[in-house]
Amino acid sequence: MCGDRNWKDASLIDSCLMSLVYDIAVNGGGPLVIIAGVAKGADSIAEDRARYHNIELDLYPAQWHLYGRAAGPRRNQQMLDEGQPGLVVAFHDDLENSKGTADMVRRAKKAGVPVIHVSHKNPGGDRLTN
């Protein structure tokens, strides 16, 4: 999960998490592991909600002190390479003007990982194609 550092809507993230849990329970698959980048906003809310629901977390903090401005994109690629997600869920109300979230979405699409973009305009999410 990734998203806007200014995202505050925990209920929408929680709803998405519960939908994923339900989908895995009904359709098989799993286990569900939330991969997040230890950032403010959507990432930290996803981490908090995952802990609340006892969902496994795989965290990738950006190493700003080592890589400066390149730390975010490096972390995003690391989450894809090491975490090997089956799905990326991006929470952002203005994805087109985003930096970090848009970078993660681009990288996921390039890697062939399905992406769902969730916003307040479309809380059910839009599946983005590669």
Where are these regions (language model features)?
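Short, hydrophobic/glycine-enriched beta-strand segments
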Residues: 1-5
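Acidic/glycine-enriched connector segments
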Residues: 6-130
